[in-house]
Amino acid sequence: MSKSLTQPWYMKKGYSDSTLGKQLYPLNGSLKIDPLNYTNFYASDGQIQSMFLFAVAVAGKPSRITAEKINGLLDDIEVDQQDDYAPDEIRRMGPLEYLMYLEHEPFIEMIKERKLGKYNTWLKLWRWFNDLVTPTIPNFLNTATIELLEQIPGVKYKTSRFFVLHSRSNAECVPLDTHILRFLRDRGVPCVPNVTPGSRQMYLGLEKIAVEALKSLGYSTLAKADLETWKSYSNGFRQFFREGDSTPEIV
């Protein structure tokens, strides 16, 4: 195992009983990330954690390669949890819970083993969650506001919205990634930058326009509209959306 089985993080916070993860997570790929099918409004405790790990890791990185790395990390965690000496409380943890249970050295070793980069940020994230006072990490991930999520090291405008958009059916937000900025320019929206705006005021203004534009495409959810738009642009097609059209025209 990656560390000796000492007191887990929730015990350090004063919780005497673990409600972490309501089921064992077998080696069946159920927690694995598929970047083309990332949306999950009914995620289990374990799945919401793997979705969050991917959201943090993929910022500024290729999605397919990052998904492979995160899935490798999930495999490493599951192997540790299946160790003959692992107690049930370890086996029941979701992936983020397990990583937060580790001390900082074995934690960062697991991150480095999968070459996820941003190691200082990951370590700050580990410290942030270990200082967090909440009954469970899944509860936090399912209920935290965008503003609260943005307090986590490594989670800014795009990451917070990417995670919320694809994990909550009632989300009214969108990450202003490259594909969305191109999408807005192709719709004739003026003054759209080539990169995600650093100004919060500019971000919120463009986000409001993007939300309405994505809704006009006629997909069942905002997350679906975002994902399909990303697929179109990442496949190398240039899209031209005429005002009022319910579906994109590929030219």
Per-range role (PLM):
Residues 53-54, 105-111, 144, 160-166:
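Short, flexible active-site loops
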Residues 1-45, 118-128, 134, 138-251:
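C-terminal accessory module of base-excision DNA glycosylases/AP lyases that mediates lesion recognition
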Residues 75-153:
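Alpha-helical ds-nucleic-acid-binding substructure associated with the helix-hairpin-helix region
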